Structures are given as C-alpha cells and as structure tokens.
Amino acid sequence: MKVLALRHSVAQVYADTQTYLHDDSKDEYENAFLISNLTTHNILYLNYSLKTLKILNKSGIAAVEVQSLDELFALIRCNFTYDYENNIVYLHDYSYYTNNEIRTDQHWITKTDITEYLLPGWKLTYVGYNGKNTRGHYNFSFSCQNAATDDDIIVEYIYSNELDFQNFLLRKIKERMTTSLPIARLSNRVFRDKLFPSIMNIHKKVINVGPRNESMFTFLNFPTIKQFSNGAYIVKHTIKLKQEKWLGKRVSQFDIGQYKNMLNIVTTIYYYYNLYHSKPIIYMLGSAPSYWIHDIKQYSDFTFETWDPLDTPYSTIHHKELFFDKDVNKLRDNSVLYIDIRTDRKNIDWKEWRKIVEQQTVSNLNIAYKYLATGKAKVCCVKLTAMDLELPITAKLLHHPTTEVRSEFYAILDVWDIINIKRFIPKGVFYAFINNITTDNVFIQPPFKLKASPTDYIVALYALSNDFNSRQDVINLINKQKQSLITVRINNTFKDEPKVNFKNIYDWTFLPTDFELKDSVITSYDGCLGMFGLSISLSSKPTGNNHLFIINGTDKYYKLDQYANHMSISRRSHQIRFSESATSYSGYIFRDLSNNNFNLIGTNVENSVSGHVYNALIYYRYNYTFDLKRWIYLHSIGKVAVQGGRYYEHAPIELIYACRSAREFAILQDDLTVLRYANEIEEYINKVYSITYADDPNYFIGIKFNSIPYEYDVKVPHLTLGVLFISDNMIHDVVTVLKKMKTELFKTEISTSYTYMLSDNMYVANASGVLSTYFKLYNMFYRNHITFGQSRMFIPHITLSFSNKQTVRIESTRLKINSIYLRKIKGETVFDMSE
C-alpha cells in the first residue's frame, strides 16, 4: 500500500483509493495502525501527522507528503521505493512506453546499433544510474527519479538463445503489461545501495554470499567486502571437454562487444578485490572505444589508463599509440591489466588472418607474464584465441557473451598462476569451451562454506535456499551467526512442502519456527527495507518466490513497535471480513467457537483469543513483516518497550487459545503449512513462558453480586473469576494481587442476558464483560509465579442450580458487585473485600 499525505482533500476520484482523516483523539501510533489496516492500495491521508508518516515508513509502508496535484498524480499512478531518510522517491513507472521509447541506465548500449532492432517508430533513451537523469522531469517538493528501465529485457535477451530482438522485446513488454510488477527485484538495487554503506559504517569485516550480475556495480565502492560465489572455471576443468570445431554462432543482432569487455573488466576487478582488498589502477591495451567506462564511473571512481591508436573518450589517461612488450615497465603495482589487442581483419585472407591472431595471442600472453613477473598486487585479464596452447592449470577462463561465438575467449591470471604448473590444451578443447560454456557471473569467487564466522558480518541475499546446500547447515549457520542479514525462501505452500521448484533448480522452504534465535529480527522484504531507511508502495505477493529476511545482531531488536511491527496485521482479515465472509464478525465468532466459548454476545469487543497471534498465523503469507516470535519472546521476558498506540498486554493463555483456533482454521482449509506453524508457535509459547495450570485446583476467586435477575437454588450464586493451585503460605501473595487489582476489579462492567445448561445438572447464567479483567488478573498472577487458571478455556458463568432448568432470556442486565473473595474449594473463605 502507499500513503499519500495531503493537507486538503481533492475532488478527483481515483480507483482503489480510500481517504483517511487523522483522528486527533488517538495518538500517532494508533493512527498509523489504523491506516496500515485499510484495504485499498492508495490511501489519501488528510490533516496528516509527520510522526505518523515516519512510523509507517519505518514499518516499510511508503508514506509521502504530497504538495501538489502533479505530485499526487505521479505517485498514485505507479509503484515506487521511498528513501524516507533522504526524501527521495524512486518510481517504477513504465508509462514511458506511451512515448514509444525503451530506457536503459547503461551508456554503452546507446553506442550500439540496437535502435535498428526496436519496435517501429521507437527510440532508446539513456536515463543514468537508477534513472537519475530523469530528476529534471519532476519539479516536486521531494527528489524524484524514475528507476524503471528495460535493461532486464536487454540482458535477458543477451543470455537467451533467441536472435530476433524485436520479437523478444515485444513479448517481454506484453508480459510486463499483463503481469504484476516484480517490485522486490526493481527496488533491490535501491536497497543494496542503502544496505551496504550502512553495514560498512558499523562493521569492518563483511562477507557477501552469492552476488549475481545485477549487483556488479553495487560493490565497486567496497573492495574490502569478501565475496563468495560459485567459483571460477579454470584450465584444469577443461579435461572433461571433448574436442570440437569452430561454431561461428551469432548471439545478438546488435553489437554487444562493449558489454563483454565491461564484464571482463568488472570480473577482473572483483577478482583483484578478493586478493588485495583495495582499488586498483586499471590499465587497458587495445581499449578503443570503451564507452562502458562511463557506466563504471557512474558508480565508482577508478583511474583508467589506456593505450590505443584510436580514441578512448572516457579513460582518465589515454595514450593514442600502440603498446609493446618493452612498455610493460610503465605499469605500476596495485593494478589490473586488460589486454584486448586484436588487429582488424579487413580484407586479409582467413588463413593469413589466423596466423596473425595466433601470433597476437602469444604476444598478449608474453605481455601478461612479463607484467605479472615483477612487482606486487597485480591481476591480468588477457584475450586469447582457440589454438594449441600451454596455460597455467589454475588460470581462470572467461567467456562472457559477445556478438558472435567464434574463436575468442579470455583468461584471468594472477602472480601465483604464472609460477604454477602449465598444461597443454589442444585447439579443439578450447573450441569446446567456447561453444558450450558462457560465463554468466562477474563474481567468480569460491563457494561459501556454511559455517559461522564470529568476527564477520555475513550478507546472503537469495543465496542459500538452493537444495545443493544442506537445509540443516543453513539453519545452523543462521542460528550461530551473531551478525548477519540472511534470506531464506519462505514456506508459503499449502501442503507444507519442504522444497519447491524454482526455474531449473529446487529451493528449500523455511518458516520462522525453523530457527532458534535471540536478538534477531525475522521479517519480510518490506520490513527489512524499513530497518534500512526505505519503504515500498507494493507488498510482496502472498505466494510465489518470497523470502524471510533474518537480521542477526541488530540494534533494532527491542524497538518492537518501530520495526517489523504489527502494522497491517489485520489487513488481510479486513479484506476477507468486509467482502466475502458470512459476516464481518466471522473471525471473532470462529475464534470463540473453536475454543468452546459459546457466548458470542459482544464477541467483537470481548474476545477470548489474541487476534494478533491468530491473524499472524492464519494469514502469515500476507503479514510476515510482523515478527511474531520476537513479539512473543519480548512479552515473555517483560521487555516490551512501546512508544505509543493502544497497547494491550496479552495473557500467555490468550496466545495459546489463538494457536488452537489457527490450528482448527488450518484443518478446515486443508492448509498443512499453517497447521504446522500454529503447532510450532504453540510449542514456542510454552517454551518461553512458564505456564502452569490449576487443573486440580484447591482455591477459587469468587464474585458475589447484590442481586441476580434469575431464580436460583444454590446458597450463594457467584461468578468464579478463576481457580488456583497454591500452598497455604501463598495465600498472602494472592491477596496482595487482589488488593492491587481492587479498583479495576470493582470497575468491571459485568452483565447477563440468558441462562443455559453448562453441563448435565449444572444450570448457569452467562456473564459478559469479564474476560478483559480475567486476563489482566491472569498476567498479575503469572508474574508472581502463582498458578491460576485451567488449561481449558475460561467460560465466565454464574452457577444458579445443580438441576436441569429451562433456559431463560432477558434484556441485558448490569450486575453490581457486592464483594470479591478467595475461598478454599470445599473449605472456608480466607479473604473477602468489598468496594
């Protein structure tokens, strides 16, 4: 949902939009809670409070001040990610298609012939990093830029087996227009750009697990982050290949040689980072035109020193000349060298051309070896061709996508490779490598071993759920790692499936109860964003490829109502209750009935079950932003710091009742996942609370009334406010609690309206208005380690007779309390108090 804050109402009516007027009788937290549970996507918030907006944003719900109709229209017509700390809106708005344009944030693409393959009459527009060049389009009170681009389509095309770009583009745009927005993927770059600077400000040693190409620019400013990926393809791996011949397959209709060079350089930079943890100088031989340097410099400042007879417009220092073997001594330490020398073929006969290429390959290798032989902190990426060749067995082979699959590939060499064993590789094996293997990641670091690292902060986004990892090892890592942000795929199946298909692999699935954590927050993508200064206008879908975000060692753990909080906890319930359910009271009725409480009078105001826990369980797919286990645990240890809102402290038994209701709901819905989740949450409640039951009680608390509006034949009709199992020396403690609660007990507004047979030969009257006081009393006794209440549901009633009677219905009648007493069962009254 998105909350757009206005000082004045607007005449225009928008679809899926609701107006909320700030309620001055409630504080900012309660207003935020009420807003978060509204069911429309767009909320126009009038007479707004800035503090309420802040509360919503910290909860991950995008809430933006709007000063004009232009701002309102821009935000209401699309989704966005909001940097609420810096007041920047990142739109995810594809309405630019109506200008017959596609967009890119990569400059090199604009220098290709891609426009020849666009839809008829369409153009390509460069919008800069995260759309920053579009800021001039929006003269708003907040900074605004449109981060939507079509780079995902272009990159997917490059890695696909399809050649017809126009058809591919058309199909993908039609898909985009007919499917829900992949909001998490679109906002992820904004998130990473906030996440890693904030982590690096606090933690010196950071590990990042499983980065992919979409993060290739994110980490350029963080050379000390240790990356782990799927490892490199090295020369010794070619032993498994059978020899093949030249294929000559075209990969892309437009020229992507620039993209290939950029990927080679970025791969080399990250390889260097993992060895030396600092930024290198980048030397390039055969550099022209390297328009992609502009893209890298948009993200991070590097020194590019280049050699080529042709211009290299974006290099820092350019030598418009050839580079020879004798020039190697010009290259300094702490650098990477990219050798991309290849003479243009022009009209040369292919046999003659082949000789030239092989000579240049040998020359390129000689330059690489000479460069690496002296000095320190050096890495080289060198262009090679398929030919009979000796290479170090540990050399890293690269084959990033290029316009045509021909004879070209690259190798990354470091100072250790050149002193390692070399292996002779025949030309046909290199062709087999070129023809069959495409390097699909600029991160070629070794795989991560699933072991905790006490001195490091571990980030693993979308990296550990794959079933080639041991599920238990993933759980152990998360349980043991003190400082981390790790995601795992949430089990949002209905059959409690332990793993699910994703593309061509399988992912393990997880529930919050799979982990045993303290000082950790388990939330959704939205909830995680709120913890790092961002909010989002569209929540994750309840089904599909969604993840739990587990933040270990966060200083926000005890800020229960600020982050990963109960905002939107009832939103799904409201959507159901006020649309398709039998009555808007359905949830209240079901919760009482499923716990054998048949007095439904006032069920919506006096419910016997925690609605928070019940909704968090049965609708967990919609509201797992709320960290239920953390909420339960902090209540159990009495460390709930609440800044505002209408706070009600649940008795532990209310939480148990909620689990029982959720369990019955799951059985009726055939939802095996909720069934397990409810069972495990109940187990967790029993683990963190020391709940004891007076199932064999020896004392009870009774309430005597001035008068009863029914006939009775018991000596003194009374309401049993609860039973206890105590030793006689604990009577004083019980009396102390009753005295503390005296005012509240006598203020309890108890009423009755009918009689019924509670069981055979037990005729009783109902008593409404009791439960809230009962649960408060329960909490007081619990904190004082006094066993109070039974394991079965407490049903307030007034015993009238021990024989069968006809039921009676009367107008609801208020009962005046005469006295409250503590009596031994089948014994004497040991304490009595009157108002």
From Swiss-Prot:
GO terms (BP aspect): symbiont-mediated suppression of host innate immune response; viral process
Kindly state which keywords UniProt assigns to this record, in alphabetical order: GTP-binding, Host-virus interaction, Hydrolase, Inhibition of host innate immune response by virus, Methyltransferase, mRNA capping, mRNA processing, Multifunctional enzyme, Nucleotide-binding, Nucleotidyltransferase, RNA-binding, S-adenosyl-L-methionine, Transferase, Viral immunoevasion, Virion
The record's similarity note reads: Belongs to the rotavirus VP3 family.
Q: Where in the cell is it found?
A: Virion
Where in this protein does the record put region GTase/RTPase activity?
556-692
Q: Where is this region: 2'-5'-phosphodiesterase activity?
A: 693-835
InterPro entries for the chain: VP3_Rotav
Q: Which organism is it from?
A: Rotavirus A (isolate RVA/Human/United States/WI61/1983/G9P1A[8])
- Grouped into one coarse class, the protein's main location is virion
* Active site per UniProt: 718 (for 2'-5'-phosphodiesterase activity), 720 (for 2'-5'-phosphodiesterase activity), 797 (for 2'-5'-phosphodiesterase activity), 799 (for 2'-5'-phosphodiesterase activity)
What function does this protein fulfil? Answer: Multifunctional enzyme involved in mRNA capping. Catalyzes the formation of the 5' cap structure on the viral plus-strand transcripts. Specifically binds to GTP and displays guanylyltransferase and methyltransferase activities. Has affinity for ssRNA but not for dsRNA. Capping activity is non-specific and caps RNAs that initiate with either a G or an A residue. Together with VP1 polymerase, forms a VP1-VP3 complex positioned near the channels situated at each of the five-fold vertices of the core. Counteracts the host innate immune response thanks to its phosphodiesterase that degrades the 5'-triphosphorylated, 2'-5' linked adenylate oligomers produced by the host cell IFN-inducible 2',5'-oligoadenylate synthetase (OAS). The host RNaseL is therefore not activated.
- Where is the segment annotated 2'-O-methyltransferase activity? 246-428
* Written domain comment of the UniProt record: Contains a bipartite N7-methyltransferase domain, a 2'-O-methyltransferase domain and a GTase/RTPase domain. The C-terminus contains a phosphodiesterase domain that degrades the 5'-triphosphorylated, 2'-5' linked adenylate oligomers produced by the host cell in response to IFN stimulation.
Query: What is the name of this protein?
Result: Protein VP3
Q: Which Pfam families match?
A: Rotavirus_VP3
The entry's cellular-component GO terms read: viral nucleocapsid
Listed EC numbers: 3.1.4.-, 2.7.7.50, 2.1.1.56
Catalytic activity of the protein: a 5'-end diphospho-ribonucleoside in mRNA + GTP + H(+) = a 5'-end (5'-triphosphoguanosine)-ribonucleoside in mRNA + diphosphate; a 5'-end (5'-triphosphoguanosine)-ribonucleoside in mRNA + S-adenosyl-L-methionine = a 5'-end (N(7)-methyl 5'-triphosphoguanosine)-ribonucleoside in mRNA + S-adenosyl-L-homocysteine; 5'-triphosphoadenylyl-(2'->5')-adenylyl-(2'->5')-adenosine + 2 H2O = 2 AMP + ATP + 2 H(+)
Q: How does it assemble?
A: Interacts with VP1. Interacts with VP2.
Renumbered to this chain, region (N7-methyltransferase activity) spans: 171-245, 429-555
Q: What GO molecular function terms would the record report?
A: GTP binding; hydrolase activity; mRNA 5'-cap (guanine-N7-)-methyltransferase activity; mRNA guanylyltransferase activity; RNA binding
